[in-house]
Every structure is written in C-alpha cells, then in structure tokens.
Amino acid sequence: MSNAKNTSAASPARKGHSHHDPASDEFRKEDFPFYWLARVHGRYTQNMERLLKKIDLDVPRWRVLWILNENGESSISEISTHAIAKLSTITKIVYRMKEDGLVDTAPSPEDGRVTQVRITEVGLQNIERMQEVTRELFQRSFKGLTEAQVQRLNRMLEVVFHNLETL
C-alpha cells in the first residue's frame, strides 16, 4: 500500500460547496438559516419575557392563552402539539394558570382521561394586557417588510417545519 493512499484515506473527503451546509468547506454561519432562526428566536424570547414580566406573565403562559384564544377549548395534548412542548411541561403550566384563574380545566365528556382547558374571563383580560405590552415589538419585528414578504416568510418557514417532522 502506498503512502499516498494512507494519507488520502486518513484525510476527510472533500465536502460540498454550499455556504449554508455546516458539512461544507464553504460554510459560513451567516448563510445558515438556522443561525438566523436561533438568533431571532433568542432575541424575540428575551424581549417577550421582558415585556410580559411587566404584567406578571411569561412566554409559556402567553403561548397557552393565545392557543386557547384562537382554538377555543382544547385538550392539554392539543395545546402541547400547538406549543411544540412536552405534554408534562404544558400540564404543569396549565395547572399553574388554573391556580392563577387564567384557565379552567375539566374532564372531557367523551373521554374522562382527557383534560379539556378553556380560557376564563381573567385569561381574556390578560390577552388584552398582553396585546398592549407586546404591540410595539410585533410592529417593529416586521418593519421594512411588506405583508406579502411576511406571508412568504411564513410559507417558507412552514415548509422547513414540515421537512423536519420526518426526522
């Protein structure tokens, strides 16, 4: 066996030429969509936590209230699916919210093992308060983008989301 073969066998094979593929020699983090998704999510979460703290709420409660506001009465499992969170995590959040009077729970009439959650009047009042304190953040987030661009961004992110379901 020649020395050249041993050297080439020990060295990694030439990788692709994509700036957005971390396995590529040409990779640049600024061209990697997940780099920007992580940064946007981090900044968004920091801002949301800061704003919601003013009204004694947090992002998990905000998420549950919005899911219930949009979907109406939902099971804890359905909330977990929409929130992309573990069932045990959402269960804890829902029961803390129940203690705070934001939601009510009841067994499902169809299946007593399923817990249904509905928003209370206090929860609805908190949605109004959440809208007031976060309005500027959402307006500023999409400044410089047209409605069509925001819709296109949503469609592209939805495709990526569904692509990741099959892993």
Curated annotation (Swiss-Prot):
Any one GO BP annotation for this protein: response to stress
Question: Which stretches does the entry tag as region Disordered?
Answer: 1-25
Q: Which GO terms describe its molecular function?
A: DNA binding; DNA-binding transcription factor activity
Which residues fall under the DNA-binding region feature? 76-99
Q: Name one Pfam family in it.
A: MarR
Q: Which SUPFAM superfamilies match?
A: Winged helix' DNA-binding domain (SSF46785)
Q: Give the induction text.
A: Induced in the presence of IAA.
- HTH marR-type domain: which residues? 30-162
Biased composition regions of type Polar residues, renumbered to the chain: 1-10
User: What other facts are recorded?
Assistant: Transformation of P.putida KT2440, which cannot degrade IAA, with the iac gene cluster confers the ability to grow on IAA as a sole source of carbon and energy, but not the ability to chemotaxis towards IAA.
- Function of the protein: Probably acts as a repressor of iacA expression.
Q: Which PANTHER family match?
A: MARR FAMILY REGULATORY PROTEIN, TRANSCRIPTIONAL REGULATOR, MARR FAMILY
What is the protein name stated in its UniProt record?
Answer: HTH-type transcriptional repressor IacR
Q: Which gene encodes it?
A: iacR
